[in-house]
């Protein structure tokens, strides 16, 4: 997808997280399955990643958005290492999922997402993200200046950054 939102760069910060929201909503509509989101944008089902999302901002402020949903893979399609962390809709639901229906639903959800982004009205998307974020209320590992640390994930801020509390009780926001 090559959306051209024509917005200032700072307004485009949440696009990757919003794409995760769109995937969750599309899967719910088509399959009835509620996905979780692992911050910042990994749709999760059955504790495993079900989708990959990549976003690139070009110099002209166009957004290149790539979304790959694991729809029909079976266990033989994943290497043992990948099978530990990834799954497919078919594997988790035990039935086939229409790729055409899912693609149509995803395009509709992305269209709604861009309308909300252009209007500056992300409150509903942020509330949904907070509801399905699997990191909130848990301890997370963060790589900061080459050093791993642990912190408690406590919230998602208005730009979809992860708000954490470190071992000393200090709050900070992590950006992807």
Predicted regions and their residues:
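Short, solvent-exposed amphipathic alpha-helical segments in soluble enzyme
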Residues: 10, 15, 80-82, 157, ...
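Short, acidic (Asp/Glu-rich) active-site segment that either coordinates a divalent metal cofactor
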Residues: 60-90
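Contiguous, small/hydrophobic- and glycine-enriched helical/loop subdomains that border
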Residues: 1-62, 85-108, 112-119
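Structural beta-strand/beta-sheet cores of well-ordered domains, especially the beta-sheet scaffolds
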Residues: 41, 51, 67, 85-87, ...
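Residue-level signal for pocket-adjacent positions within structured domains
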Residues: 38-39, 48, 73, 77, ...
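Glycine-rich, charge-dense phosphate/pyrophosphate-binding loop(s)
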Residues: 104-176
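A short, well-structured catalytic beta-strand-centered motif of the EAL phosphodiesterase domain
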Residues: 53, 67-69, 152-154
